[in-house]
Amino acid sequence: MEPTKGGLLASEDSAVGKYLRSVDPDVSAASWAFRWVASLEGIKYILSGMGNTYQVEDNAKTFKNFKPLTEEEYGVIARCVQIIRDVPRVPCTECRYCTAGCPMSLPIPTIIKFYNETLTYAAEESSKYVYKRRVPADVRASNCIGCKNCEEQCPQHIKISDIMKLASEKFDN
């Protein structure tokens, strides 16, 4: 389990981060996530990938005098889940049917995954960085030729060539 989804949910700039700040400006999104996990029955250990002193101090503060979530706070978490679900995303299931027909051998589900992360978590810069490290230049979204072979194979009827253009605008410039 990754309660902060590799740090994406802890982003103060995301819709969830802004909502949590409106509920309690003194508590970080990461703290909310860790308190939720620690309040679950049967949890014995929680690992946190921390990248700076602030995160270490925030985690220590969260667990120093730990209090499980209250019913009201579970309502706050439920609202966070709804905020994430309400974000319009490309409904890709990563079935990979689209890749078989792609003459450019694009990793279409991977590109869509990165694109969706920018929509869901307000993580454009980090997604762009990881995209450029994980997707080789010769198979990036900008290499889509718009043939739509992929769209014929997609059981979700996603307009993949349009999404590749949008992803290219976000990541390949």
PLM regions: where:
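Structured C-terminal cap/extension of enzyme domains
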Residues: 2-173
